[in-house]
UniProtKB/Swiss-Prot annotation:
Membrane-crossing residue ranges in chain numbering: none
Annotated segments matching region Disordered: 1-22
Protein name: Large ribosomal subunit protein bL32
SUPFAM superfamilies reported in the protein's UniProt record: Zn-binding ribosomal proteins
């Protein structure tokens, strides 16, 4: 296993770590009943009635779980 010969300075350590970036999530735009919503892909969607009461979860057009 490689071992550093000298201690890395704070400035160099922080400079190296500043390159670590989190990627923004890729959202999918869906239009339902005239409302636009954004969600993560490959996740079950909550289906609700007109009053806003949650009914069930849906994935790829199939019911997968009760709400």
């Amino acid at each position: 296993m490689a071992v550093p010969k000298r201690k890395m300075s704070r400035a160099n350590t922080r400079m190296r770590r500043s390159q670590w970036k989190a990627q923004a999530p890729k959202l999918v735009k869906t239009v339902e009943n005239g409302k636009v919503s954004y969600s993560l892909p490959h996740q079950a969607k909550l289906v609700s009635d007109s009053a806003g009461t949650p009914l069930f979860y849906e994935y790829k057009g199939r019911k997968v779980a009760d709400a």
